[in-house]
């Protein structure tokens, strides 16, 4: 268990999220489980699980059964709330107001053109997929303090000539 409190649903974004988010976050808070602990129990990446909680990812039938077990939510409730397609990209206002989320936005603002140029030089004309994609968050510690390490891994998709 982490020495930090578990993440809960922020009231300001709750109205923009599906009912499943409220159900999942309520159970997460009640059980005092981190996304890492839930991910381990479900057998998924913690970012994928968090995205599912925020309505930004689709749950498989296996995910639903595992979430039901770890969070003590009836499987029928999760099946009814998680069986549809996610409505991605609507949970945040732009630009973001939360300082941490804004820093991620700022990284793209500041380094996006540089990332694009370097990726084009390495791969050619195309884009990095956010569908054939994985990501993870790691914590590193050294003599200067604690560091957040975010890895983004997306399949390279070259533009087609036509």
Curated annotation (Swiss-Prot):
The active site is at 103, 106, 129. GO terms for biological process: cyanate metabolic process. Its EC number is 4.2.1.104. Keywords: Lyase. GO terms for molecular function: cyanate hydratase activity; DNA binding. It catalyses: cyanate + hydrogencarbonate + 3 H(+) = NH4(+) + 2 CO2. Pfam families: Cyanate_lyase (PF02560), HTH_3 (PF01381). The keyword Lyase applies. Transmembrane segments: none annotated. It comes from the Eukaryota. Catalyzes the reaction of cyanate with bicarbonate to produce ammonia and carbon dioxide. Belongs to the cyanase family. This is Cyanate hydratase. It comes from Phaeosphaeria nodorum (strain SN15 / ATCC MYA-4574 / FGSC 10173) (Glume blotch fungus). The gene is CYN1.
């Amino acid at each position: 268990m982490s020495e930090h409190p578990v993440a809960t649903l922020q009231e300001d974004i709750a109205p923009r999220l599906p009912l499943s988010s409220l159900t999942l976050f309520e159970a997460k808070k009640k059980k005092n489980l981190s996304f890492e602990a839930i991910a381990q129990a479900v057998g998924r990446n913690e970012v994928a699980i968090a995205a599912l909680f925020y309505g930004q990812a689709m749950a498989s039938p296996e995910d639903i059964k595992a979430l039901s077990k770890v969070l003590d939510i009836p499987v029928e409730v999760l099946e009814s709330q998680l069986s549809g397609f996610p409505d991605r990209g609507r949970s945040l206002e732009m630009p973001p107001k939360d300082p941490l989320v804004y820093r991620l936005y700022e990284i793209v603002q500041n380094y996006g053109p540089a990332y694009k140029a370097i990726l084009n030089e390495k791969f050619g004309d195309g884009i990095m997929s956010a569908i054939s994609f994985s990501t993870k968050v790691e914590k590193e510690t050294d003599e200067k303090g604690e560091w957040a390490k975010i890895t983004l891994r997306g399949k390279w998709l070259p533009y087609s000539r036509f």
